[in-house]
């Protein structure tokens, strides 16, 4: 019995060691990272706001040389601009050879390697261009840290579409919506944006969503980021048909049962938020009519949304409780997760915006402005009455 107890005690001591041995070591700081005569520090300074770019040439690259005896198991690339085509190459017998073709599906991309010591990222479209990166990270073999993103495709069919104008709007104005439904309730949630503002904020967007437990890649629109209090002016800048068509495509392509978007007054009067809200109402009301944007109807079919909620409002208002602990996220509340995610929007930390359910633009009140399943009676759940 004593021998068995001693063996069990020894195993208990060894288990943490085994677990630790499986964790991938970050090797970025150990690498010699080069790209011809171009300085590369901004590609690996842990600052998403200091984008790195190569020379403008055919096949621009960023090369990594690990110390002797060290090998790479993973390469995590955060692009500032998606290349037309790219790959990871290894030098074998004096020649660069492709070891992994890069995907253009995700702006933050993870590549599994197989013990390379010297390798490079290369843009291989054949045209003269620049390689533009926000950050790169190199890891050895093993289990990656939780913050490294390995995105899955956008859900083919949405239960819920969350439509925000800019990065961080989904946190400030919609509070715990995303972690509550995408993670705790395990709904198919499509998070979509009209604009990503700039490359740094797009990376912050992804970092924030990932922190909240989102694993399906968002839809990131390309409308320009500018300010006006006028909805008419913003429609002029974005194009009324283009903005409405973008939202209509989201609805017909992803077929959500419920849609959540901005206050019709633009939250604090922002014209771009007003356009998002107005275009969303238009698209929801007309998505079942094949004569409206007929090309999209032919491509995706028509669709009938069951419920549309706008942030705030004065009629048919429900209050969402974002302070309920989520078992799926270790007991943190969805509001806490949204607040933590907002901290990852580093460029916005000097603004006056906060993630809270208090105040005039608090993120807990929503108005039901369109429904095919009747009014909310109980409240507190976007999916009340949804079939």
Predicted regions and their residues:
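Disordered, acidic Ser/Thr/Pro-rich linker "stalks" and the adjacent N-terminal cap
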Residues: 22-72, 78-86, 90-97, 101, ...
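Bacterial N-terminal signal peptides that target proteins for export
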Residues: 1-8
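A general structural signal for short secondary-structure junctions and capping/turn motifs
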Residues: 2, 210, 250, 297-302
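Sec/Tat signal peptide C-region and signal peptidase I cleavage site
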Residues: 17-21
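The feature marks non-catalytic terminal segments
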Residues: 23-24, 28-51, 152, 181, ...
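Active-site beta-strand->loop->alpha-helix modules in alpha/beta enzyme cores, enriched
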Residues: 81-84, 92-293
């Amino acid at each position: 019995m004593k021998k068995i107890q001693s063996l069990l005690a020894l195993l208990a001591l060894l288990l943490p060691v085994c677990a630790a041995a499986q964790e991938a070591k970050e090797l970025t700081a150990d690498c010699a990272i080069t790209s011809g005569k171009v300085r590369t520090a901004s590609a690996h300074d842990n600052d998403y706001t200091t984008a790195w770019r190569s020379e403008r040439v055919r096949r621009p690259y960023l090369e990594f040389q690990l110390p002797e005896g060290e090998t790479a198991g993973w390469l995590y690339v955060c692009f500032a601009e998606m290349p037309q085509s790219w790959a990871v190459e290894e030098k074998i017998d004096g020649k660069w050879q492709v070891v992994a073709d890069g995907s253009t599906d995700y702006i933050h991309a993870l590549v599994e390697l197989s013990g390379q010591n010297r390798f490079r990222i290369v843009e291989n479209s054949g045209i003269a261009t620049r390689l533009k990166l926000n950050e790169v990270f190199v890891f050895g073999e093993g289990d990656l840290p939780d913050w490294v993103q390995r995105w899955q495709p956008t859900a083919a069919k949405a239960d819920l579409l969350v439509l925000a104008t800019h990065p961080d709007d989904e946190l400030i104005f919609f509070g715990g919506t995303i972690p509550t439904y995408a993670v705790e309730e395990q709904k198919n949630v499509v998070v979509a944006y009209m604009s990503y503002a700039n490359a740094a904020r797009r990376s912050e967007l992804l970092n924030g969503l990932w922190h909240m437990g989102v694993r399906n890649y968002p839809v990131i629109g390309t409308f320009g980021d500018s300010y006006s209090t006028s909805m008419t002016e913003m429609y002029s800048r974005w194009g009324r048909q283009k903005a409405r068509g973008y939202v209509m495509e989201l609805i017909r392509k992803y077929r959500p049962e419920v849609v959540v978007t901005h206050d019709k007054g633009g939250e604090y009067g922002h014209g771009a938020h007003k356009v998002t809200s107005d275009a969303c109402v238009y698209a929801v009301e007309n998505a079942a009519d094949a004569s409206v944007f007929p090309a999209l109807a032919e491509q995706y079919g028509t669709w009938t949304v069951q419920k549309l909620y706008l942030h705030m409002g004065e009629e048919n208002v429900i209050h969402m409780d974002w302070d309920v602990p989520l078992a799926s996220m270790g007991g943190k509340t969805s509001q806490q997760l949204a607040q933590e995610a907002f901290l990852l929007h580093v460029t916005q930390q000097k603004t006056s915006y906060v993630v809270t359910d208090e105040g005039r633009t608090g993120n807990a009140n929503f108005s039901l402005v369109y429904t095919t399943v009747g009014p909310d009676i109980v409240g507190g759940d976007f999916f009340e009455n949804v079939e």
